[in-house]
Every structure is written in C-alpha cells, then in structure tokens.
C-alpha cells in the first residue's frame, strides 16, 4: 500500500513559475512526483508546446513527472532499478498507479489544473501509462489524448477545469 510522505505539496521556484513536489513510497521504494506549470509567457516556447499538445495550452496546465527519488537525487532520471532492487510483488504496479492517481487528484483539487502533460520516457513507462489510462479518474480527467509528440510517447489529460 502506498505511504504518502508529504502532507501537502512542497512549492519551489521553477523559472518564473512555482513548481510542486509530492513524495510517496511503496514498500522500500521512494518516489517523487513533480508538477511544473507549462510556460505560457514565452510565445515561441508556448507555440511549440501547443503544437505538440494539439491545442493552445492555457494557463494552469502542468507537466507532470514521477521517478524514483534516488534517480532524482543523482540526476540519472528514469533509470530502472537493479534486479535486486525491484519489487517482487504482483500488485506493485497497481499500487503505483493508485498513488499517482491519488496525488494527481489532490493536485487537481488544490491547484485547479486545467490539464496535465506527460511524456513516457521509456517504452516500459509507456506501457504502464497506456494500461493505467484505460480507466482514468473520471472525476478529474474528462479527456485523454495519447500518442502525442516525438515517438508518440506524450499524453495530455484534460481536466474538468480545462474550459474554465
């Protein structure tokens, strides 16, 4: 069962914006989830990201990423754990999906996010996202766009606040 190590989102500066961090663990595996608002103040970058997403990205849309905490601390992002560090439990990925859904729902409720953008950095992560997003949390996500961006590894989750 996931254990949420953060009581609230930790806010920290990220360029002109404030990013949000939430930590959790499953068994002995520590994870971090980061939310960074998509930059809309730079017209060239905003156009690039909007083209990638397939719509003009409004404010309050967030890039969301998660990784193992040790990868984040070492700067070797998305590196899989060694075989000896992998969980052997069959329901580990279900618990991981539950934790991510809970944290995204909490973020949505606190920050009234309009959309979340994510990129599956590895084929294994893409398979995980594809499986999880077959049944997104409908109280938060009303539309999922998958297969976006370079290599079709990108996702957009539009929320109930998207048109507000």
What are the residue ranges of the model-derived segments?
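Non-catalytic substrate-recognition and accessory regions of acyl/acetyltransferase enzymes
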Residues: 1-164
């Amino acid at each position: 069962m996931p254990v949420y190590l953060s009581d609230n989102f930790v806010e920290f500066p990220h360029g002109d914006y404030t990013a949000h961090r939430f930590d959790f663990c499953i068994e002995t595996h520590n994870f971090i989830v980061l939310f960074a608002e998509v930059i809309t103040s730079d017209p060239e970058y905003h156009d690039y990201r909007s083209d990638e997403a397939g719509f003009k990205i409004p404010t309050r849309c967030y890039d969301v990423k998660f990784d193992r905490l040790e990868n984040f601390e070492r700067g070797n992002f998305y590196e899989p754990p060694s075989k000896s560090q992998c969980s052997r439990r069959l329901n580990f990925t279900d618990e991981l999906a539950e934790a991510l859904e809970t944290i995204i729902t909490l973020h949505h409720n606190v920050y009234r996010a309009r959309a979340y953008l994510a990129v599956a950095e590895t084929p294994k992560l893409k398979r995980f996202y594809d499986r999880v997003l077959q049944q997104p949390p409908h109280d938060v996500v009303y539309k999922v766009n998958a297969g976006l961006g370079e290599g079709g590894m990108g996702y957009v989750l539009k929320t109930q606040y998207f048109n507000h």
